[in-house]
Amino acid sequence: MSKIRVLSVDDSALMRQIMTEIINSHSDMEMVATAPDPLVARDLIKKFNPDVLTLDVEMPRMDGLDFLEKLMRLRPMPVVMVSSLTGKGSEVTLRALELGAIDFVTKPQLGIREGMLAYSEMIAEKVRTAAKASLAAHKPLSAPTTLKAGPLLSSEKLIAIGASTGGTEAIRHVLQPLPLSSPALLITQHMPPGFTRSFADRLNKLCQIGVKEAEDGERVLPGHAYIAPGDRHMELARSGANYQIKIHDGPAVNRHRPSVDVLFHSVAKQAGRNAVGVILTGMGNDGAAGMLAMRQAGAWTLAQNEASCVVFGMPREAINMGGVCEVVDLNQVSQQMLAKISAGQAIRI
């Protein structure tokens, strides 16, 4: 099997050296070239035709975002962004994902060499995922049509959503058309700390419903979406007659914290047939067992179809496990989940 050919673009000579060490330490990939800026990278892309590009967000001569936008228009290819953990860095990274980047890795703030080398397996996994990702499914999505407001639903009704690679844009596409009469939504997207708040704030500006990073102990309200904070699990709990959110630092599940399975299992237990579960694009199997638990508890469950997924891993695993009632295109997810939650349609298996 041929190796994954990687080209790294970063203005830091140290970062280029570290990325080369990391990529070349894995037998299934190789660093074919590095570039100090996008202008040099343009010629190297033509010369080496890499499978995956790693791209620093902030660089001289040409900004990483400007280069990414031009690249996706003229020569689309899988890109993994390399970002700082600052507030500005997280906002720029979210914009990069909107423009078509597949995923991102974060630079440690201290001890760059030791920190990046510690991330070696994670970086390799993101490069492998990017190499297999569907670029056709990851074209920038147009704003979906706003759905008509439906009847106000019981506060017992809620929707749980899980996603990973490609999920930030998929979630935006699902939330943007939702009317204020929507039930509460609990969302777990695999993301590091710092990024989830920026992600929630970005969505809050784009959506009619309120979107925020979830906080421990807060009451779950209709017309609001709650994003699990990075590196912390989110569960649905009860306080008397009301739902509330529980945030905790339990061990990683399926190598993830936050984990979709943790959310889905809690929703199965607390909401049962009053819930709809949705699993979107992502690598791995997180959420499959939890979605089966939701279906067995009477919830209606939806999976994004392969044609519209950047990575079909998580939906495929949930389908194969028998946890999915219906498979739909991303463009139909919002409408279908609202239709099912309004009709109260649920089945037991």
From Swiss-Prot:
GO terms for cellular component: cytoplasm. Involved in chemotaxis. Part of a chemotaxis signal transduction system that modulates chemotaxis in response to various stimuli. Catalyzes the demethylation of specific methylglutamate residues introduced into the chemoreceptors (methyl-accepting chemotaxis proteins or MCP) by CheR. Also mediates the irreversible deamidation of specific glutamine residues to glutamic acid. Keywords: Chemotaxis, Cytoplasm, Hydrolase, Phosphoprotein. The modification 4-aspartylphosphate is found at residue 56. InterPro entries: CheB-like, CheB_C, CheY-like_superfamily, Sig_transdc_resp-reg_Me-estase, Sig_transdc_resp-reg_receiver. GO terms for biological process: chemotaxis. Disulfide bonds: none annotated. The active site is at residues 164, 190, 286. It is an enzyme of class 3 (hydrolase). Belongs to the CheB family. It catalyses: [protein]-L-glutamate 5-O-methyl ester + H2O = L-glutamyl-[protein] + methanol + H(+); L-glutaminyl-[protein] + H2O = L-glutamyl-[protein] + NH4(+). The gene is cheB. The lineage of its organism: Bacteria, Pseudomonadati, Pseudomonadota, Gammaproteobacteria, Enterobacterales. It comes from Escherichia coli O157:H7. Phosphorylated by CheA. Phosphorylation of the N-terminal regulatory domain activates the methylesterase activity. This is Protein-glutamate methylesterase/protein-glutamine glutaminase. Coiled coil: none annotated. Contains a C-terminal catalytic domain, and an N-terminal region which modulates catalytic activity. The keyword Cytoplasm applies. Residues 152-344 form the CheB-type methylesterase domain. One of its GO terms (molecular function) is phosphorelay response regulator activity. Residues 5-122 form the Response regulatory domain. It comes from the Bacteria.
